From Swiss-Prot:
It comes from the Archaea. The keyword Hydrolase applies. It comes from Saccharolobus solfataricus (strain ATCC 35092 / DSM 1617 / JCM 11322 / P2). Keywords: Hydrolase. Belongs to the UPF0173 family. GO terms for molecular function: hydrolase activity. Pfam families: Lactamase_B_2 (PF12706). This is UPF0173 metal-dependent hydrolase SSO0099.
Length: 227
């Protein structure tokens, strides 16, 4: 059974059977996180980082140390920086860049384009596919036309989209991205109302997405849905 749990901000936990995949794991400094870092001790298999801003890189290094068998999936440039800076072993790294799928323990992973900034590598989105379900996590991004290609190539069932504005898409722009991506089962807003700088009314996103004929799914921090 595939499940998705939103942990507040951009942090997202995907579960496929007994495998746990976390994306952009800011936990300790996340005022919306429903769990403490210890919750993940020996409980993660794959850690995905879309880019190196602190609210997305988050607790990645500590989580890798708490989960010796876990693998890091990010751009190779970012992985190399983290490996050199924090002495992360090569065995913990899945080398990758924007492109096709890499399969790890039956879970298919890919990185996509994102329009944002990042110090040690280009920013990305992420695709996770297993058990017949495909999830697109857009990372931090503005609206860009190639989102249509992401939808056509990966055909996501669910799209997690930042809507907080200022640093990423706002609700209106995110609703346009839904039209481009065409998620088959739902569009999930993330990266909003964590702090005042990205405070928006999520109902604006809901109304816009519904009016375009798609299914908005608003989660509370800690809420789990079956995919």
């Amino acid at each position: 059974m595939a499940q998705l749990r939103w942990l507040g901000h951009a942090a997202t936990l995907l579960t496929f059977g007994n495998k746990n995949v976390i994306i952009d794991p800011m936990i300790k400094d996340n005022p919306l996180s429903p769990v403490k870092l210890d919750y993940f001790k020996n409980n993660l298999d794959i850690i995905i980082v879309t880019h190196d801003h602190y609210d997305h890189l988050g607790d990645t290094v500590e989580l890798l140390r708490m989960n010796p068998k876990a693998k890091l999936f990010a751009t190779y440039d970012l992985e190399a920086h983290l490996a050199e800076t924090y002495k992360i072993s090569e065995e913990s790294i899945i080398p990758a860049n924007v492109g096709g799928f890499v399969e790890v323990d039956g879970i298919k992973l890919a990185l996509t384009k994102a329009v944002h900034s990042s110090t040690h590598s280009d920013p990305t989105g992420a695709i996770v596919s297993a058990e017949g379900i495909t999830v697109y996590h857009a990372g931090d991004t503005g609206l860009f036309e190639d989102m249509k290609l992401i939808g056509e190539v990966f055909k996501p069932d669910y799209a997690l989209l930042p809507i907080g504005g200022r640093f990423t898409m706002d609700p209106y722009q995110a609703s346009i991205s839904v039209e481009l991506i065409k998620p088959k089962k739902g569009a999930i807003p993330i990266h909003y109302n964590t702090w005042d700088l990205i405070k928006v009314d999520v109902n604006d996103f809901v109304k816009l997405v519904k009016n375009k004929g798609y299914n908005p799914i608003v989660l509370q921090p800690g809420q789990t849905i079956t995919l």
